[in-house]
Amino acid sequence: MADSTSMDHDGEQRGTKRKRDAGAGGSGAGIGKGTSNYVKEGYGPNMSEMVPRNIMNKGNHTVYHVVKQQKYLDFNYVSNQNPYIIPYQTAGFWASMWDQTDIGSNNTINIMKALNNVSVGVTWIKGEITFEVYAVTRQRLLTGTTNQTTWDFETSQNMFIADADREPENFNLATAAATGPLAQQTTQTLLFNANNDRYTKYELPQRNQYTREYDFQQLTNNYMWKPTDISAAANFRRLIPMAEGVYTTTAATTKMAELTEQKSVYAGSGKTTEASLFRNRTSYPRMHMAQPQVPDETGYMKFRYQVRMSTKLHLVFHLYPDYSTSTNIEYMGRQVLELPEVTATGGVVTCMPYEIKT
């Protein structure tokens, strides 16, 4: 005989229990059964589910948002064959800070700004950079001349991506323009020297997409990053979630300092929050876009690459509770950390190719 408690019927047979589901309809609706973890609200048949709005639990009351941008770039190696630096370590790189003219028309950036205003904190999930080479041209001397040049399409020529993943490197961060992919070229001319093993090179063929993903460091114990308009030029010194190593130029015993500074004191906290207490030290190698250094009659071959670059920045915004007031916002802010920031003087981003666990 079948188990009466597992039979799916409405009680036609005497001695069996009527099944009560939490769905709509019937006198058993909304009794509190079901598989959800939501809080029940209401009375009797009108009882409905309500999402708990507990600001101490980051899993609730959140909005997932992706900041997207797409640019067409001209990597020009005619006058300078040195590699370009892709400054993805800067927060402004992910929100077109280096191209202020296009920010206003980018709705994903505008949504990010709006969410910043209603959020107590932000969790950075990951970033994606996709490159696609759609045209390559080469400048060369016109046949039979010594000063007349022409341009040829090089359909078989590829571009190169190189990571400085065997030694620390750095780049300057003096202005908002320095957060752009066309702002800085390196001084190292030997990236493709046969004896150079400091860099790992990847070849990027034409009409192929190359995507790089960066998983950002996750804070623990409900700590969050402070909502910041990373498209504003005033915040150009801000970096993605990280901790950096420091060049020790004085002595081997010089302290390794965090580049994260917590400058604002929240009411009731009594002292500033030391961000280094909650994070391991991690960083990212310096990234370059380069051409092959092949000599010709004018020195090195002079290529120009037309590249489509698209980025995606995955963020989770932790919204204020429904009934937050100006007096308790500061209290909630005790678990919010400032994004890392380079100093105003010097302005050097140190790119560490390895992690330092503490």
Curated annotation (Swiss-Prot):
Q: Where along the chain is composition biased (Gly residues)?
A: 23-33
- Enumerate the residue ranges of region (Disordered): 1-37
* UniProtKB keywords: Capsid protein, Clathrin-mediated endocytosis of virus by host, Host-virus interaction, T=1 icosahedral capsid protein, Viral attachment to host cell, Viral penetration into host cytoplasm, Viral penetration via permeabilization of host membrane, Virion, Virus endocytosis by host, Virus entry into host cell
What does the entry list under GO cellular component? T=1 icosahedral viral capsid
Q: List the disulfide bonds.
A: none
Q: Which GO terms describe its biological process?
A: clathrin-dependent endocytosis of virus by host cell; symbiont entry into host cell via permeabilization of host membrane; virion attachment to host cell
* Location in or out of the cell: Virion
**Domain of life, per lineage:** Viruses
Q: In which broad location class does this protein mainly occur, judging by the first location in its UniProt entry? A: virion
Indicate, by first and last residue, each region the UniProt record lists as having compositional bias (Basic and acidic residues): 1-15
What this chain does, per the record? Capsid protein self-assembles to form an icosahedral capsid with a T=1 symmetry, about 22 nm in diameter, and consisting of 60 copies of size variants of the capsid proteins, which differ in the N-terminushe capsid encapsulates the genomic ssDNA. Capsid proteins are responsible for the attachment to host cell receptors. This attachment induces virion internalization predominantly through clathrin-dependent endocytosis.
| Protein name (database record) | Capsid protein VP1/VP2
Species of the source: Aedes densonucleosis virus (strain GKV 002 002)
Lineage from the top down? Viruses, Monodnaviria, Shotokuvirae, Cossaviricota, Quintoviricetes
Q: Which gene encodes it?
A: VP
